Curated annotation (Swiss-Prot):
Pfam families on file: FtsJ
Function: Specifically methylates the uridine in position 2552 of 23S rRNA at the 2'-O position of the ribose in the fully assembled 50S ribosomal subunit.
Protein name: Ribosomal RNA large subunit methyltransferase E
Listed GO CC annotations: cytoplasm
GO molecular function, one term: rRNA (uridine-2'-O-)-methyltransferase activity
Broad class of where this protein is predominantly found: cytoplasm
Reaction equation(s) it catalyzes: uridine(2552) in 23S rRNA + S-adenosyl-L-methionine = 2'-O-methyluridine(2552) in 23S rRNA + S-adenosyl-L-homocysteine + H(+)
Keywords: Cytoplasm, Methyltransferase, rRNA processing, S-adenosyl-L-methionine, Transferase
Active-site residues, record numbering mapped to chain: 164 (proton acceptor)
Domain of life: Bacteria
Family: Belongs to the class I-like SAM-binding methyltransferase superfamily. RNA methyltransferase RlmE family.
Amino acid sequence: MTGKKRSASSSRWLQEHFSDKYVQQAQKKGLRSRAWFKLDEIQQSDKLFKPGMTVVDLGAAPGGWSQYVVTQIGGKGRIIACDLLPMDPIVGVDFLQGDFRDELVMKALLERVGDSKVQVVMSDMAPNMSGTPAVDIPRAMYLVELALEMCRDVLAPGGSFVVKVFQGEGFDEYLREIRSLFTKVKIRKPDSSRARSREVYIVATGRK
């Protein structure tokens, strides 16, 4: 992509971003990101979070989902969060900065979970997008497979999993894999998710 084309594309993205009603609402409410609204819509539909829960948040920065979940699980709840990027502290959130694909980071995350019974694993992870689906989709699928592996390791029976997935090659196989592990699986496209985006959210409940 030439610099001129990239500049035009970036300008369009910025214009769309700042005119987005959810971005504007997030700024007014002092929220960390518009992702807060996506999780709020999912919670209204699926009632994933309850007071006192332990939750794992993958791809947490800048903290929109953790910020939302804190309001749902209360002071006795606990969030263990991880992201490659830094995140400003949130009371009630134990944050680990590191690459979730790195075995040492995964080990450190599991150590922080310890013997806790995790009721929800949530992942809003996404790779740096190149704009080429043949490159981006496999990278994204690798991340969501790792998130599902985390579910296998830490999620308590009856627990829930919410994960952002980009529709494309590997999506149907991944959905089948999730259905084999959970009793109820739904696909959500929140209103606050941009219509042109390939992203959807798989909401799986009732870990077998």
